[in-house]
């Protein structure tokens, strides 16, 4: 027997946006914004600031991909079970803020590699965990929520390059400071979300 789903009612939109699912959607926007902003500007940043060669930039992206594969494939699931999905998201958001501010303090190839390694870890633990959390939030409107999540992610991928590119023209370090501030807002939102869930 196939269970019929309740058709989406726009009166439910308010409860979704202002409920737990709404918090997750905001976090998805913030996470994708930070990732797109950092990834899009770093190639230019390391060339302009340090004069990195194409080979050095390639090594950074290769290391990023390798760490992402290892952490997401082998560590994210066990960590989520051990400390909880919400706490793992909070840690990942904090790491994103740390990465953004730390990039301003980098002094060369090794420090950039270390900072971007942390960026890879934060990406590997936040994105899949957020998606998993969203899928458990509201079974009745799961398809609608996934659509909202996709929209939030895509919107951030449009806004982030435009904003960071504009800021980069004024000061090459300003995109990192701005992204770090946005990531800290994400940390606060995540903390409030966790506290609200505990109080229920």
Predicted ranges, named:
Residues 141-169:
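A late C-terminal transmembrane helix in Major Facilitator Superfamily
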Residues 164-183:
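A membrane-interface helix-boundary motif in multi-pass transporters
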Residues 71-85, 168:
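Helix-to-loop junctions at the C-terminal end of transmembrane segments
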Residues 40-57:
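Short amphipathic helix-loop junctions that connect adjacent transmembrane helices
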Residues 1-27:
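Juxtamembrane intracellular "pre-TM" segments in multi-pass secondary transporters
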Residues 85-130:
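C-terminal transmembrane helical hairpin of 12-TM major facilitator-type secondary transporters
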Residues 134-142:
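Paired intracellular helix-loop junctions of major facilitator superfamily
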Residues 18-37, 117:
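Pair of pore-lining "gating" transmembrane helices in MFS-fold secondary transporters
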């Amino acid at each position: 027997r196939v269970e019929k789903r309740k058709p989406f009612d726009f009166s439910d939109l308010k409860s979704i946006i202002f409920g737990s699912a709404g918090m997750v959607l905001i976090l998805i926007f913030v996470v994708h914004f930070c990732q797109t902003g950092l990834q899009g500007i770093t190639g230019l940043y390391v060339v302009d600031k340090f004069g990195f060669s194409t080979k050095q930039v390639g090594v950074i992206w290769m290391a990023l991909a390798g760490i992402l594969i290892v952490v997401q494939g082998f560590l994210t699931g066990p960590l989520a079970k051990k400390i909880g999905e919400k706490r793992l998201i909070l840690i990942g958001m904090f790491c994103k803020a740390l990465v953004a501010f730390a990039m301003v303090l980098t002094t060369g190839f090794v420090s950039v590699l270390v900072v971007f390694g942390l960026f890879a870890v934060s990406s590997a633990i936040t994105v899949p965990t957020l998606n998993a959390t969203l899928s458990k939030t509201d079974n009745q409107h799961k398809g609608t929520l996934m659509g909202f999540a996709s929209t939030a992610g895509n919107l951030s991928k449009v806004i982030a390059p435009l904003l960071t590119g504009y800021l980069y023209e004024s000061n090459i370090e300003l995109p990192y400071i701005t992204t770090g501030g946005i990531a800290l807002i994400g940390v606060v939102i995540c903390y409030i979300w966790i506290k609200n869930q505990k109080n229920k």
